[in-house]
């Protein structure tokens, strides 16, 4: 189980170019929350996730982790965060096995070969573990990146379209993992154009905060 945490959004507004996407977004995400950020294309879902991950600045307002602004505790905050965006962070010259082994080394104190074999099976890459990532399809590269989720010890997961290029079975496996992470006291925030098959899922629609 994770310690209790809270991610607070305080009066957030977001601007892209000359256009304000949303205004006055205030809410809390607490340990155990599994939340889908909804809204039409262009409303600012990815922009919001980047703000929450500390990769972009809001027009107004601030993001707080356990009551302190993330801008004042960047290193500690990022130790508690796993962010997966559209850039996968997969090293193309490394094999699927080597990429997962690299993720394990940076996220876990102990190296466990059996865990990596089990993980290759979970992400559907058994038999392709020795191929360089550059030779794999976009969907297979996405699976390598998603392997980080099973290795992560961070309580806060921020995931931008994690189901893209993933088949129905893969979506079910990932959703079960997200449910489990939340039940252990983690926080999962994601965007998705697909239905998320979870009875624990909460939703936040940015349309309610759309700028006039």
Swiss-Prot record:
The keyword Electron transport does not apply. GO terms for biological process: cytochrome complex assembly. GO terms for cellular component: plasma membrane. Part of the ABC transporter complex CcmAB involved in the biogenesis of c-type cytochromes; once thought to export heme, this seems not to be the case, but its exact role is uncertain. Responsible for energy coupling to the transport system. Belongs to the ABC transporter superfamily. CcmA exporter (TC 3.A.1.107) family. It comes from the Bacteria. The keyword Cell inner membrane applies. The gene is ccmA. It is a peripheral membrane protein. It is an enzyme of class 7 (translocase). Keywords: ATP-binding, Cell inner membrane, Cell membrane, Cytochrome c-type biogenesis, Membrane, Nucleotide-binding, Translocase, Transport. This is Cytochrome c biogenesis ATP-binding export protein CcmA. ATP binds at residues 39-46. PROSITE patterns: ABC_TRANSPORTER_1, ABC_TRANSPORTER_2, CCMA. Its EC number is 7.6.2.5. It catalyses: heme b(in) + ATP + H2O = heme b(out) + ADP + phosphate + H(+).
